Structures are given as structure tokens and as C-alpha cells.
Amino acid sequence: YQSEHGDYSLEAYFGKVTIGRFNARLIANLDVPQDELEALTSHAVKRVKTEEGSTRWTLNADKQQEQGSRKIRTLSYIPDYSKLDADYIRQRFGEPESFSVVNETTQLWVYPQLGVRILIDTHGRELFEYISPAQFKLLEEKK
């Protein structure tokens, strides 16, 4: 995956999973240096441009297998159910340490002590992202 800004990332998509009463998509963002990520694009069997301007590659089966031993940087959980409002999240996680407005329908709530960031979207699906607390500090420092 290459963002519209040119940064590369490697995601492992686990498809739909059921956790508790929620069906969700589970995605692991793997820890790979940028130069290695760029080199991996030559092993793609498929390339897709997204509406946002990013590019998504699908690696061949051998390269997918090789990358499976990488450390997980973040783990994203995207429930199919899209009615998880701020009150529901506040009841389960408490008040966020910080939050920011992403756009008119979306807020980012940050819980560094838990290693959790939550995108709350009033017109779409929520996204829960887990980052180890040690990595969370590094990620926040890069901003």
C-alpha cells in the first residue's frame, strides 16, 4: 500500500472475523522498513488505484508467505455494525486523553495508556486501532 503522500505500508488482511457479538474486518499493519516496502511492489500480482489517490498492491503468494513473520505495528478492527456512537465508546473506554476532528462526520479519539485510537464516524463505520503502548509513544512523537 502506498499513501497519496508516497509513504508505503504492508497490511495483512484477515477477512471477516467474529469477536463477541460483532462481525468485523481485521487488518494487521506490519513493521517493514520503507526501502523494503518499495522493493516489494515489484512482486505484486495486482495494482489498484483508490479514489483517495493511494495505490494498493497485492503480493504474489510466495511474498505474502514470507512477510507473515513480520512484527505487527498496529492492529485495526472495523466492525460491520456502524451504529457505535460516542456514548457507547465512552462507556467502554472512558474519556479519551485527546481527540481531534478529522472531518465533519469523523472524530479521532486517543487512549495512549491503552494503546488505542478510535475513529468515530457518524455516517460510516468506526475503526479501532491497537498499537502497543511503547510504539504508541513513538507514533505520536512523529506527528
Write out the residue ranges for each language-model feature.
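A cross-family detector of function-defining hotspots
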Residues: 1-143
